[in-house]
From Swiss-Prot:
Enzyme class: transferase
EC number: 2.5.1.87
Keywords, alphabetical: Chloroplast, Magnesium, Metal-binding, Plastid, Transferase, Transit peptide
Cofactors: Mg(2+)
Catalytic activity: n isopentenyl diphosphate + (2E,6E)-farnesyl diphosphate = a di-trans,poly-cis-polyprenyl diphosphate + n diphosphate
Subcellular location: Plastid, Chloroplast
Protein name: Dehydrodolichyl diphosphate synthase CPT5, chloroplastic
């Protein structure tokens, strides 16, 4: 049965993003509500977001199983990827196609992300890298940027205790210096509080550029050469990899990349790290990406023969 709630005082997005009524009654579609519990979204900072109760994106604590969970029969544990990277694309288009405010597209996307993390945790994935905000996203309307910053802030505050309790480690890759100071402080707190956890490592790419990641690694190596610590002939791919921002994880190169919404590009994400990654492009918008779609991606991955540039056997 569809779930409805009131959205009060919709934030003033430009007309091209959404309409601006004072009160809208929204139907959350049955196929989405069956997968995850419905909760309202909290307002973002700077009064830029919709006034949806933040429980809309709260964690269903019963969904995390700290014991080993049997895999779906279609999957082999021996062939599971250790590290999955995700470009969570399509939140805005999902909302627009339904005549909903963009804020609800992101809210639905966060609910789906929670389910995705739950499944990854229960199915034994070791690392997730999530493309949350690119360095190019600053060019979006200020109201939308403020919304996203507020969402990052709210989710971190709400989930820090759960992350620590369930053994999930959080790391941030990207240039955090441009984020709001309060968000930077919260990120530092969350990273420190979870750094000893090892059940699942979640890397969130915020203000991230794959090109700049390589550039900053080269700058660091160049400085080491200048300081006389290494010679130019010491530079190799392993040394570069050790200076990339994904050096914080045990598995810096993803085994599988999933991109939703039917777009067939990398969008400046993990350009070095994806050299031998298997790619899976889903036609589903991110808010529609559920367990069935995740299972399809994993089955596709397990049917492939990874050659890393070599010949097939």
């Amino acid at each position: 049965m569809a779930f409805s709630f009131q959205l009060q005082q919709v934030f003033p997005f430009p007309v091209k993003f959404c309409s601006q009524p004072k009160s809208i009654k929204l139907q959350i579609f049955p196929n989405l509500t069956k997968r995850l519990p419905i909760h309202p979204l909290a307002s973002a900072q700077n009064n830029a977001t919709s006034n949806i109760d933040h429980n809309y994106i709260a964690m269903d604590e019963s969904s995390i199983n700290e014991e080993e969970v049997p895999l779906p029969t279609e999957l082999s544990r021996e062939l599971m990827p250790k590290h999955i990277a995700v470009i969570m694309d399509g939140n805005r288009r999902w909302a627009k196609r339904r005549g909903l405010p963009v804020a609800l597209g992101y809210a639905a996307g966060i609910r789906v992300l929670r389910n995705f993390v739950k499944l990854s945790y229960n199915w034994g994935i070791s690392a997730l890298t999530l493309f949350a905000f690119s360095s190019e996203n600053w060019f979006r309307p200020k109201a939308e940027v403020d919304l996203l910053m507020g969402l990052f802030d709210k989710v971190l505050k709400d989930e820090l205790e759960n992350l620590a309790r369930t053994g999930i480690r959080l790391s941030i890759i990207g240039d955090a210096s441009q984020l709001p100071k309060s968000l930077q402080d919260l990120i530092d707190k969350a990273v420190m509080a979870t750094k000893a956890n090892s059940r699942l490592h979640i890397l969130v790419a915020i203000n991230y550029s794959g090109q700049y990641d390589v550039v900053q690694a080269c700058q660091t190596i160049a400085q080491r050469v200048k300081d006389g610590n290494i010679e130019p002939e010491d530079i190799n791919s392993l040394l570069v990899e050790q200076e990339l921002q994904t050096k914080c994880t045990e598995f810096p190169s993803p085994d599988l990349l999933i991109r939703t919404s039917g777009e067939l590009r990398l969008s400046n994400f993990l350009l070095w790290q994806l050299a031998y990654t298997e790619l899976f492009f889903s036609h589903s918008q991110w808010p529609d990406f559920g367990e069935a779609e995740f299972l399809e991606a994993l089955c596709s991955f397990q049917q492939r023969q990874r050659r890393y540039g070599g010949q097939s056997s």
